[in-house]
């Protein structure tokens, strides 16, 4: 049986670099015009290091993907769509529970009640901690554990936990906040990090 290990973290900003040409053409969110301002942050990589025929602009079968020399991914991780606008946290937790147990222990609204999820602000990290404490699982969280504070340490953190078969539940606080599960990381086989890819199980992904 798989060891029940889980990581909970608040990630204020997760920047998935690479494929920015695609974003410029497809994203409804303005991300700036190259050359209009000095390049800073992710903007400095616009058009650089794009991977020709990248599999991530197709529809990869993440469920059946296998790790290789540059991809680390949790196999057979099933995604779940959240049933309300505010239960991304409970849905993310249930995805992880199902990954380990083959089924959920509580329905999404029951998990939301245990977490103290709110229709106005959703679920905070303490709520996540409350649920996994209730079901008796071993886990780490940003409430009590050290979390990476730079890109290089973050990559090590992600790779080491995925190789240890440990999903990472993360929340970004931009645009109202949203919980997802990191299930994979791909270096794309290059030394630079501007084309790296994080693979997330997103309970609000309707594609």
Outline where the language-model segments fall.
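Active-site catalytic microenvironments for nucleophilic, acid-base chemistry
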Residues: 95-100, 185-188
